[in-house]
Swiss-Prot record:
Residues flagged as site, Interaction with tRNA: 126, 352
Keyword flag Disulfide bond: yes
Upper lineage: Bacteria, Bacillati, Chloroflexota, Chloroflexia, Chloroflexales
Stretch list, region Interaction with tRNA: 163-165
Disulfide cysteine pairs (residue numbers): 101-213
Known role: Catalyzes the 2-thiolation of uridine at the wobble position (U34) of tRNA, leading to the formation of s(2)U34.
Name this polypeptide is given: tRNA-specific 2-thiouridylase MnmA
Amino acid sequence: MAKIMIAMSGGVDSSLAAALLHEAGHDVTGVTLHLWEGDDDRLAESLCCSQEMTESARRVCAQLGIPYYVFNYQREFRRSVIEYFLREYASGFTPNPCLECNREIKFRALLARARALGFDYVATGHYARIRVDKTPADHSASPSPNGAQRAVYRLLRAVDEEKDQSYMLYMLGQDDLARLMFPIGEYTKAEVRALAAARGLASANRPESQDICFVPGGDYRNLLREERPDALRPGPILDLEGREVGRHQGLPLYTIGQRRGLGIATGQPMYVMALDVARNAVIVGPESALRRTTLRAERVTFVSGSWPEAPFDCLAQIRAHADAVPARVTPVEPERVEVRFEHPQRAITPGQAIVFYDGAVVLGGGRIARD
């Protein structure tokens, strides 16, 4: 029996994860991370920090007969996630705040707190899997000096490919995976709902939220206007030859691949190609120019903890819901790689993550850099 802290959002995924661990005989404690203090009009009931979702998690824990606590991480969330989100947009990147929340709050901070409180593991309702290989399959882990086999932890895609969240977890390393559990990674979403309903869990039919928790409705522009009005400086919209074809209302309001809302008339459809921070300019061009075969990535980490010594072939995924496609990754220097795709990719976006896979196994990933 293990002592397990499970992070609970109030939704069906983490609720079933808690139930499965409890039924397996583990000593389970549910916790909800209070990250964002939105007012009632701004914070939808379906979002993770709402009072309704907190009460949902509390009801499930009461139903299971396990302890439940709420941890306040508002200060850490603002510093590590909201400020990052605003800073990235102001710098001409398109950020992924949920990925940063996973990195800094849901795993780094929560794992540290769980360890301090004497828990063996942290579990979540993420759709991903962890596999433990006793015999190393690569050179990243060698047998221990006494000849005993060493455990090597692999992060894998979930069984449900549509719900798979491994892209958002690429930053996890060996020490993290050794203390994490993803109980629902072997199930499809339909199976999760059915299993939750069979147990009578209060959250079995709760709808999913697709919004960023601190940007209900998905419109981040109001947050930028409130907190970083200095970043919304009007400037030129330039074509690929440098000709001004219009004016923009601030770089953070645009993203790579955008067509609508540009307010320009050039005789052909034009798309955002790049955000030129130095000139405070939005660069536009035809759809064909959006496709590229190469990119550079920075802040790259590998699940194995070892840096590759040579180029390697893999499947690379450049956004959360994109397909992973064949590519070759060439290490350049610590934490930086160059990636060449077998076929051109559309709208490669600086600030988003690129994640490397070997089949279903996550190798690592990093942030797409600006050219």
